[in-house]
């Protein structure tokens, strides 16, 4: 399962992860087939308009994704 597929499970959640779903869905460049958390985190790091709080949400979602894959 790609990270994109995983994060869609939080669709309609009234949580920061639900907000992340919306943000990712609106990003036409998001690597939808990517499965490696390092590559996903690198994708977010290269964006200049990401604040620290948002990046922490991304890291939390990647941690949950890694737990699922284990």
Where are these predicted regions, by residue range?
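Short intrinsically disordered terminal tails
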Residues: 1, 67-70
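N-terminal acidic leader/helix
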Residues: 1-27
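Short, charge-rich amphipathic interface segments used for partner binding and complex assembly
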Residues: 36-67
